[in-house]
């Protein structure tokens, strides 16, 4: 896969493309895309018997403060094949910190042209409360049994915060 050939999206930051690395509900394995080789690599086996609460991946041509492309959790119920690209609408951000520093997760839903299921979801606060609790619980505990690793959940950011975060990540990648 030539990641350079995949666009950020047709109208960033309102919609962005996400390259999926880990499917919702899959085995507790963390995959990461080798950005230069375009190959999906097994990063690690999760020590906790937990599954991702959404399809997880990154936005190409972005750079977060940790030096990686920005992470995205796509809130939908159908597992996507790792390596596929899905167009999404960002609705919020879960602000976290881990043993490596600040680590934000964009929360998004599939774009309306893919499914109408999420067309009335515009902000993370439109999601069911239990979904938000499950997302926070997963990220707070998925590294629990890994030696030397920890995660602290901070605040949630709204749709505007997510858009601002994406714009900054695009600019950071351009300046690299």
Curated annotation (Swiss-Prot):
Residues reported to bind Mg(2+) 1: 66, 71, 103
EC class name: hydrolase
Reaction(s) the record says it catalyses: diphosphate + H2O = 2 phosphate + H(+)
The keyword Transmembrane appears for this protein: no
GO biological-process terms attached to the record: phosphate-containing compound metabolic process
The entry's keywords: Cytoplasm, Hydrolase, Magnesium, Metal-binding
Pfam family, one: Pyrophosphatase
Cofactor: Mg(2+)
E.C. no: 3.6.1.1
Cell location: Cytoplasm
Any one GO molecular function term: inorganic diphosphate phosphatase activity
Subunit structure: Homohexamer.
Family recorded in the similarity comment: Belongs to the PPase family.
HAMAP family: Inorganic_PPase
Matches recorded under PANTHER family: INORGANIC PYROPHOSPHATASE (PTHR10286)
Protein name (Swiss-Prot/TrEMBL): Inorganic pyrophosphatase
Originating species: Brucella melitensis biotype 1 (strain ATCC 23456 / CCUG 17765 / NCTC 10094 / 16M)
Gene field: ppa
């Amino acid at each position: 896969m030539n990641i350079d050939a995949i666009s950020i999206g047709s109208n960033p930051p309102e919609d962005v493309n996400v390259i999926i690395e880990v499917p919702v509900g899959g085995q507790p394995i963390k995959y990461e895309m080798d950005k230069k080789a375009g190959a999906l690599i097994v990063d690690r086996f999760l020590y906790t018997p937990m599954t991702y609460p959404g399809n997880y991946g990154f936005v190409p041509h972005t750079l977060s403060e940790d030096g990686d492309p920005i992470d995205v959790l796509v809130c939908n119920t159908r597992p996507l094949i790792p390596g596929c690209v899905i167009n999404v609408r960002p609705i919020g951000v879960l602000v976290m910190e881990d043993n490596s520093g600040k680590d934000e997760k964009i929360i998004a839903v599939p774009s309306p042209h893919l499914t109408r299921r999420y067309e009335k979801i515009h902000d993370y606060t439109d999601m069911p409360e239990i979904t938000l609790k499950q997302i926070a619980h997963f990220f707070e505990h998925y590294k629990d049994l890994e030696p030397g690793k920890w995660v602290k959940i901070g605040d949630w950011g709204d749709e505007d915060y997510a858009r601002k975060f994406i714009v900054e990540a695009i600019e950071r990648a351009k300046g690299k």
